[in-house]
């Protein structure tokens, strides 16, 4: 492990943690950063493990609430329905992810220009939905009906195209379906737990033969950086979107996507 690879691992870990739970596409940012920093050769193991750091971050922040909901579920119909809603929203990603995993990883993930374009388009959509979404009918995350949860799950499948953003797709879907801005972000947090844990396990299984023990140092640096950054973001985001909405992230996507697209078209 050299100083340069450690620094790049730190940068990518921070990037993963800072962007995983805001609607800007952590995968898109990671792939573009890896392309421009020349870190693409680090292998799948690095990407997979640092995302686990982000999963553990949201579990850490929401541990007490998750435990209380699980304990209440046998006697509280609303808690039981909420857990069912999260699991139901998770199912479409399982089906599509298993069926299309090879195409997504070998074709879509290798197209930086597509990622930049999706960042821009997603930013435009996010700005529009943030301003034009219908008045919310579900202002608490536990109020989301099962049918709405399933539809949010189908929105999540759009995020398998890198640059779309898992949190962005689920938040946009939730807003369009009548969920309040804070509740939309919180539902996205809860949905990320089974989705990202499942993606981690599946990717780890698929890439078990290419895990690089020699990269453990970089992986550890990226993992810790992703975990710490994600904890800060999860604790900050709900209060921010309750007051200001999602327009900041829409403009962020458009600016980053435009800069990346211009650089790629110039041959970088």
From Swiss-Prot:
Location in or out of the cell: Cell inner membrane
GO terms under biological process: cell wall organization; peptidoglycan biosynthetic process; regulation of cell shape; response to antibiotic
Enzyme category, top tier: hydrolase
Disulfide bonds, paired cysteine numbers: none
UniProt keyword list: Antibiotic resistance, Cell inner membrane, Cell membrane, Cell shape, Cell wall biogenesis/degradation, Hydrolase, Membrane, Peptidoglycan synthesis, Transmembrane, Transmembrane helix
Keyword Cell wall biogenesis/degradation tagged: yes
Recorded topology in the membrane: Multi-pass membrane protein
Chief location: membrane
Reactions catalysed: di-trans,octa-cis-undecaprenyl diphosphate + H2O = di-trans,octa-cis-undecaprenyl phosphate + phosphate + H(+)
Pfam families xref list: BacA
Miscellaneous: Bacitracin is thought to be involved in the inhibition of peptidoglycan synthesis by sequestering undecaprenyl diphosphate, thereby reducing the pool of lipid carrier available.
Protein name: Undecaprenyl-diphosphatase
Gene of this entry: uppP
């Amino acid at each position: 492990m050299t100083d340069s690879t450690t620094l790049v691992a730190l940068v990518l870990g921070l990037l993963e943690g800072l962007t995983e739970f805001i609607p800007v596409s952590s995968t898109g940012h990671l792939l573009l950063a890896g392309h421009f920093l020349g870190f693409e050769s680090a292998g799948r193991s690095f990407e997979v493990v640092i995302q686990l750091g982000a999963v553990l971050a949201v579990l850490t922040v929401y541990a007490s609430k998750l435990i209380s909901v699980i304990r209440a579920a046998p006697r509280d119909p609303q808690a039981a329905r909420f857990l069912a809603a999260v699991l139901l929203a998770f199912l479409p990603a399982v089906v599509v992810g298993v069926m299309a995993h090879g195409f997504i990883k070998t074709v879509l993930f290798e197209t930086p220009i597509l990622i930049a374009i999706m960042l821009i388009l997603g930013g435009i959509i996010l700005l529009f939905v943030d301003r034009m979404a219908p008045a919310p009918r579900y202002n608490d995350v536990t109020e989301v009906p099962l049918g709405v949860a399933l539809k949010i799950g189908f929105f999540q499948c759009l995020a398998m195209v890198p640059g779309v953003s898992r949190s962005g797709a689920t938040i946009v879907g939730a807003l369009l379906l009548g969920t309040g801005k804070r509740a939309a972000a919180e539902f996205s947090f809860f949905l990320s737990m089974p989705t990202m844990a499942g993606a981690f396990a599946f990717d780890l299984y698929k890439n078990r033969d290419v895990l690089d023990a020699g990269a453990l140092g970089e992986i550890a640096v990226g993992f810790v950086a992703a975990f710490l950054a994600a904890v800060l973001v999860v604790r900050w985001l709900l209060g921010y979107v309750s007051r200001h909405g999602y327009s900041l992230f829409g403009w962020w996507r458009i600016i980053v996507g435009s800069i990346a697209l211009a650089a790629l078209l110039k041959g970088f």
